[in-house]
Amino acid sequence: MKELLRTLISQGLAGCYADGSLSSGEFPSIIIEKPAHADHGDFATNVAMLLAKAEKKAPRMVAETLVSHLADGSGVCEKIEIAGPGFINFHLKDEAWRQTLLEVDQIGFEYGKSGVGGGKKIQVEFVSANPTGPLHIGHGRGAALGDTICRLLSATGWDVTREFYYNDAGQQIANLALSVQARCFGNGPDDPGWPSDGYQGEYIIDVARAYMARETVHADDQHVTAAGDPQDLEAIRRFAVAFLRREQDQDLAAFDVHFDVYSLESDLYADGSVERVVRRLVDSGHTYEQDDALWLRTTSFADDKDRVMRKSGGGYTYFVPDVAYHLRKWERGFTRVVNEQGADHHSTITRVRAGLQALDAGIPAGWPEYVLHQMVTVLRGGEEVKISKRAGSYVTLRDLIDEVGRDATRFFFVMRKPDSQLVFDIDLAKQKSLDNPVYYVQYAHARICSIFENAAEKGFVVPGADGVNLDQLIEPEEMAIVKALAFFPEVVEGSAANFEPHRIANYLQELAGLFHGFYNKNRVITEDSQLTAARLFLLKCVALTLKNALNLLGISAPEKM
């Protein structure tokens, strides 16, 4: 609909320039927006205000001239009017809106998708948890957001690669190995042999038991058989990382989250990538020695202070392998990369980008892009839940999936903007009532399926486009649904472009609400066969769109509840 109006306006401007009623010859970018108030029309544009300066006329005068040249050959407009300082408002005919239903029916389960990405490559890195324990609820929110962003990008024509980066080197992994070793020797957190920064969750006992039993674990590209020797700390490290990678993979599979590529920090050290990046940075002239440490002059690239690359003791700080990893992404041909991470990674953005800029590799200053999500608070009975028996110090993703189910967990994780803190109310997520947002949406789909069953029992068939008279749909509740369906592709494009999955969750609640409101006020099966057919056709389009939108969130559309 918006494209049709843009064409109408462009043709009107061409007519104005052709007869001299306007003289600038400019064709500005035509923005078509939905007005805040319904009485201002279905769509509005400020194009006259954009042209006023070039035309040396008041915006309303430009608007009046343009409107007089708008030839609505397709007959979609009921009324075109000028409002305020020069807005042009378009009121569309109901008949034009109802054509949306034919489009939904024709496109079916592809409705809402587009090709705006043009098949271009984009890599999305998300979750990227350290393999030191079960995934926590922060990882869960990142998994839901990252996976939904990937689904949205794929739906809008991008060639998406999903990637998980394991920080399997460094002090945290060393602490993991020491913790497992202590358990192998029968020591616990209260014993003298326990490491000062050891991991205390029950899962460490499971790792130690499996290691001593010489089990073999399979995690993506790794197959590791335990040595069973409690003295071999390196063997313990390798096995513990593989064991916990497998556990994380299983949790993500239960969450219906999958990856195309797994990358390991340890590989960057093993194949020399980290050392090569350090040499390139030194050769670039952006480093200096101070206090027996190697520094990168990141203040030359918008950082608030210079950063240590190599500590005085000889080890590299964590952002050095991060720079090496992102350089590898660039060299793999990903000119567009999105990192979905927790907000606690905010400080790393500037230094990673600075390191990449210092390489003089032609990487744009704003590369990569970031989506940062805020923390999650879990409530049960109005009280915050802080610990899990298995993890020891935090609530795990598996805890939530097991208690409230995958669908509710995914919906709750994405129903707020990523940069908003999220309160996950377990009691609400488990409710089978319309107060529960995911139940509210899924029940709308199941309710429509039930209506179809009831219609079939009474001899009615859900019609195709050829067997329906859409002019029967005249009630305000019906037209509100039709208009909401028409905006779905735009919602998908906006959600993908801005990495904001919550827009889909909001849309689902809005559409479900419109359906419930319609159903509570109107009968679907009536004595008028044409009206019944039209309403069944309308509900078929609603069910299709609900299912398409739920699929973008990785959530099922049940037919019975």
From Swiss-Prot:
SMART domains noted in UniProt: Arg_tRNA_synt_N (SM01016), DALR_1 (SM00836)
Residue window of motif 'HIGH' region: 129-139
Cross-referenced InterPro entries: aa-tRNA-synth_I_CS (IPR001412), Arg-tRNA-ligase (IPR001278), Arg-tRNA-synth_N (IPR005148), Arg-tRNA-synth_N_sf (IPR036695), ArgRS_core (IPR035684), DALR_anticod-bd (IPR008909), Rossmann-like_a/b/a_fold (IPR014729), tRNAsynth_Ia_anticodon-bd (IPR009080)
One GO location term (cellular component): cytoplasm
Gene Ontology BP annotations: arginyl-tRNA aminoacylation
Entry EC no(s): 6.1.1.19
Gene3D superfamilies referenced in this protein's UniProt entry, alphabetically: Arginyl tRNA synthetase N-terminal domain, HUPs, Isoleucyl-tRNA Synthetase, Domain 1
Pfam (any one): tRNA-synt_1d
Compartments reported by the entry: Cytoplasm
Disulphide bridges: none
Top-level taxonomic group: Bacteria
GO MF entries: arginine-tRNA ligase activity; ATP binding
Key words, A-Z: Aminoacyl-tRNA synthetase, ATP-binding, Cytoplasm, Ligase, Nucleotide-binding, Protein biosynthesis
Catalysed reactions listed for this entry: tRNA(Arg) + L-arginine + ATP = L-arginyl-tRNA(Arg) + AMP + diphosphate
Keyword Nuclease: no
Subunit field text: Monomer.
Family that this chain belongs to: Belongs to the class-I aminoacyl-tRNA synthetase family.
Name of the protein this chain belongs to: Arginine--tRNA ligase
Gene that specifies this protein: argS
